[in-house]
Design a protein with these regions (language model features):
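Short glycine-rich anion-binding loops that position phosphate/pyrophosphate groups of nucleotides
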Residues: 95, 120-122
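Surface-exposed, flexible loop/turn segments at secondary-structure boundaries
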Residues: 14, 122-123
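Active-site/ligand-binding loops adjacent to catalytic centers
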Residues: 1-92, 129-149
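Ser/Thr-glycine-rich phosphate-binding loops at phosphate-binding pockets of nucleotides
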Residues: 93-97, 114
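Catalytic phosphate/nucleotide-handling subdomain of diverse soluble enzymes
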Residues: 102-119, 126-138, 145-147
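Buried hydrophobic packing segments
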Residues: 79, 97-105
């Protein structure tokens, strides 16, 4: 599809692809060791400490158009914004994906279509940094709203 663009993203503090550092491999293609550019990051489910062979093959074949790194803070921000404004409950990875979709949308031509897949919910992250700013008890305004519906 000549008009379709594939955008990759990865945590800005763990730039496995963006660093251009080589993933050392065993003779069977599996990772021989952790990638030298891997660092801990808050985007759960993203960027293990190695580049899988299937991803490396796609990178080598240039099956993507652009790589845009994302910060964990941006992922947390957009995850909470999606919950507050759209009722979409997702984890930091979903917020990070959406953060990049917003960046792409801001520079896209008018009339462009952008697909952003957010494949999980936030229920598994209730005790994570994602919900640090949310009180566990309802305030009076929330109680009144609850009683009104």
């Amino acid at each position: 599809m000549p008009k379709t663009k594939l955008i990759l993203t990865e945590p800005d503090v763990a730039p496995l692809i963006g660093s251009n550092n080589i993933q050392k491999r065993n003779s069977d293609g599996s990772a021989a060791e952790s990638h030298p550019s891997w660092n801990p990051h808050p985007i759960q489910g993203w960027t293990t400490d190695f580049i899988p062979l299937v991803l490396q093959e796609a990178i080598d074949e240039k099956y993507y158009d652009e790589l845009i790194p994302v910060s964990g803070d941006d992922g947390i921000f957009w995850s909470t914004e999606l919950a507050k404004k759209e009722g979409i409950i997702t984890g930091v990875s979903g917020g990070s994906t959406f953060a990049i979709a917003i960046k792409v949308a801001k520079k896209a031509k008018p009339g462009s279509n952008i697909l952003c897949m957010i494949p999980d919910t936030a229920e598994r992250y209730m005790s994570s940094i994602l919900f640090d700013s949310i009180d566990s008890e309802m305030n009076n305004e929330e109680i009144d709203l609850y009683k009104s519906v």
